[in-house]
Each structure stands twice: as C-alpha cells, then as structure tokens.
Swiss-Prot record:
Major location (coarse): membrane
TM regions (residue ranges): 4-24
Lineage: Bacteria, Bacillati, Bacillota, Bacilli, Lactobacillales
Its membrane topology: Single-pass membrane protein
Record-given protein name: UPF0154 protein SpyM51556
Family in the record: Belongs to the UPF0154 family.
C-alpha cells in the first residue's frame, strides 16, 4: 500500500477512536449521575438554610424528589 493510503487510514482510525471515546464517556457520565446524583438532601438543607429558610424535613424530601424526577426526565429525553 502506498504511504498516502496509510496516512488516510491512520486519520480515519484516529477520528473513529476520538468520536467513539467521547460517546462512551458521555454515556458513562450520564449513567453515573443518574445513579448517584451530586445533590443530596443534606446539601439541599444547607442551601435552604443559607437562603434564610427554615425547611422542614418534608419540604427537603419533596425538593429532593423533584430534582431526581427532573434529572431522570432529562436523561430519558436525551435518549429519544
């Protein structure tokens, strides 16, 4: 094979590897965030108290469930 074909194959393989790696990394990050959200009830409690609110446990849990529901909806919307 000529040198030009080898260079072309190398560029194509590099492009496929980069795009494949980006796709796989994106899916892994979405899965990780979906399973283990970064925002916890303790963090919500801290944010509400910093804003001057005195949240009840029910309000914290409601906010947490809404955040989880929205993140799952965003992930499922992205899969369509």
């Amino acid at each position: 094979m000529s040198t030009a074909i080898w260079i072309l194959l190398l560029i194509v393989a590099l492009g496929v590897g980069v795009f494949g790696g980006i796709f796989i990394a994106r899916k892994q990050i979405e899965k990780e965030i979906g399973e283990h959200p970064r925002l916890t009830p303790e963090a919500i409690r801290e944010m509400m108290s910093q804003m001057g609110q005195k949240p009840s446990e029910a309000k914290i849990q409601q906010t947490y469930r809404n955040i989880i529901k929205q993140s799952k909806a965003a992930v499922s919307k992205g899969k369509k």
